[in-house]
């Protein structure tokens, strides 16, 4: 069903609107669905990074005021082609990672074990759970409590590499804890000095 004239937004137009929470939003229209009254705006990045943008989905039923700042009348550029196989592969990978994470939680793996698994998986994709054990490249098995000395396998480069990753992971975790403790103590020191 086509939208009646005057009740739609052209892709590429600049639009400003006020939400029901009195927030002013402004950006370029990237999509508009007339039936659901949903508007997608491309706005400057909230992170401030150049060459990045935020895409906001706005339900126009909750907008009190809409103003078209610059209406685009020419035909919008053609949509970019999508690499469907790449998207499917990424979705499959994400699903596998979430299932692996869910398995670890249901198996009662400690938070430290889950974090170590994620650290290893960033470097070596070929790692999986086998009950509560982490199996890396079908060669190295890490058993609870997941320390360097819990890495077992045939002596060689794979075992050595995994041990280095585990060692670095726990060094980084310890550094993070020290940093958090010092940040937590800073307000206490300032309060003691000001009294």
From Swiss-Prot:
Q: Which UniProt keywords apply?
A: Acetylation, Cytoplasm, Phosphoprotein
What would be one Gene Ontology cellular-component term for the protein? cytoplasm
* Molecular function terms from GO: RNA binding
Domain Sm positions: 2-72
Q: Where is the AD domain?
A: 80-174
Q: Where is this region: Required for NAADP and TPCN2 binding?
A: 4-67
Q: Where in the cell is it found?
A: Cytoplasm
Sum up the protein's function in the record's words: Nicotinic acid adenine dinucleotide phosphate (NAADP) binding protein. Confers NAADP sensitivity to the two pore channel complex (TPCs) by acting as TPC accessory protein necessary for NAADP-evoked Ca(2+) release.
Its assembly, as annotated, is:
Found in a complex with LSM12, TPCN1 and TPCN2. Interacts with TPCN2.
Q: What is this protein called?
A: Protein LSM12
Annotated organism of origin? Homo sapiens
């Amino acid at each position: 069903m086509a939208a009646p004239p005057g009740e739609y937004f052209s892709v590429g137009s600049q639009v400003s609107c006020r939400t029901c929470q009195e927030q002013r939003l402004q950006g370029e229209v990237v999509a508009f669905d007339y039936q659901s009254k949903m508007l997608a705006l491309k706005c400057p990045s909230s992170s401030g990074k150049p060459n990045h943008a935020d895409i906001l989905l706005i339900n126009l039923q909750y907008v009190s005021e809409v103003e078209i700042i610059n209406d685009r009348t020419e035909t919008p550029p053609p949509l970019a082609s999508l690499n469907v196989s790449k998207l499917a592969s990424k979705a499959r990978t994400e699903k596998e990672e979430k299932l692996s994470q869910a398995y670890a939680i249901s198996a009662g793996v400690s938070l430290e074990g889950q974090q170590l698994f994620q650290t290893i998986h960033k470097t070596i994709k070929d790692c999986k759970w086998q009950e509560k054990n982490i199996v890396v490249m079908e060669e190295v098995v890490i058993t609870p409590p997941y320390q360097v000395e819990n890495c077992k396998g045939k002596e060689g480069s794979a075992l050595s590499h995994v041990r280095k990753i585990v060692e670095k992971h726990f060094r980084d975790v310890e550094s993070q804890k020290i940093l958090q403790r010092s940040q937590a103590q800073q307000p206490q020191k300032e309060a003691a000095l000001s009294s």
